Amino acid sequence: PTEISASTVRPSPFLRSVESPVSVKIISISDIENIPGANKDIARIVRSYPGVSFSPIGYRNDLIVRGGGPSENTFFIDGIEIPNINHFATQGASGGPVSILNSDLIREIKFYTGAFPANRGGALSSIMDITLKEGISEKQAFKATLGASEVGMSARGHIGSKTTYIASARQSYLQLLFKLLGLPMMPNYIDGLFKVETKLSRYNTFTLIALGGIDRMKLNTGIEDNENSAYILS
């Protein structure tokens, strides 16, 4: 008989991607909720990572990765490429003042700064691969949130035995706050997210995702013209 020595197998406590073991950072929902100063904005969360800096315009979340430009970043939501995931976006950039996504419906984010996966091409600086949560087949769940700039409502549940859904709607109150402070502009935004999944068979699932936002900017005509207002608008 042949004797075989004993072997001890221990799992690694760290989740590593086989395709991009070094250049990918995995952001969980707990990271999104607990990182201070980010206001649950997924673009602001990664600013503490090596090689990542922000636009010098303080109120925007444009990403500058490894010396690249703000337009060289690509975003994916459940494998679908999205040009920009922010409100009040500008042409030639990938950022904005606030994210269009409700973080309550995000399950995980993979942030690549190099060695991009073959099925996530089209970027020069970085890729942010966002995975949404799935609906709940056993119950209906609702959540209301009050953020620094908006109020929102999200829902997760099921429609029948084979269809699940997630949904979110948010409305900003910045226009009221800016008017109260006497600022010359009054920004306002609305966004919504809807995802439905229907199980057609054991191996096939139909998925529909809808994402949209409306941005509005008005001048506060109820204040007097002064040097401070002219400076802010310039």
Question: For the regions a protein language model found, what residue spans apply to each?
Answer:
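Outer-membrane beta-barrel channels and translocator barrels
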Residues: 106, 137, 160-162, 199-203
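Hydrophobic, lipid-facing positions within transmembrane beta-strands of outer-membrane proteins
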Residues: 61, 124-126, 140, 146-153, ...
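Short acidic/polar hinge/loop motifs at secondary-structure boundaries
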Residues: 63, 80-111
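Flexible loop and strand-edge segments within Gram-negative outer membrane beta-barrel domains
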Residues: 174, 205-234
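Short, acidic, small-residue-rich periplasmic hinge/interaction motif at the N-terminus
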Residues: 1-35, 70-72, 78
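Transmembrane beta-barrel strands of outer-membrane/channel proteins
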Residues: 6, 142-148, 167-173, 208-214
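Extracytoplasmic beta-strand/coil segments of soluble accessory domains associated
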Residues: 34, 38, 43-84, 107-108
